């Protein structure tokens, strides 16, 4: 059976892993201990119930394949070197390492425990704040403004944008 190693367990990586799970020997390499639904991360910063919902365990993702928690260090030919797992042989390699944005839009921590603590700290800070300044009126800034004003209607929110 064809061996496919996917580096990155975000939206793209898990989509490919699930699609190939029945037809290939799939290995998904991911640093984080859980899948993070980043689309809901801004809501989680203002709503404690959502903070638990954005973290989904990888253990039920694949029926046949496996998830290796580690960092891909190098690719040499058909071999992927992974921290904590050694070398993984692959016939095909998929790089699905995704993107990085600052917190609270994305959680870059490998441990969901640390990420949940950051969310809780952000929520507590928002509860105690009378006003908030959000720098950047792009998609994330506007969405975060909406989440904050919805969850904390009395909060004064200033959205700062450098461009016209």
Mark where each language-model region is:
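Beta1-alpha1 glycine-rich phosphate/pyrophosphate-binding loop at the start
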Residues: 2-66, 143-164
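Surface-exposed, flexible loop/turn segments at secondary-structure boundaries
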Residues: 34, 101-102, 140
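FAD-binding core/adjacent interface of flavoenzyme oxidoreductases
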Residues: 2-4, 63-135
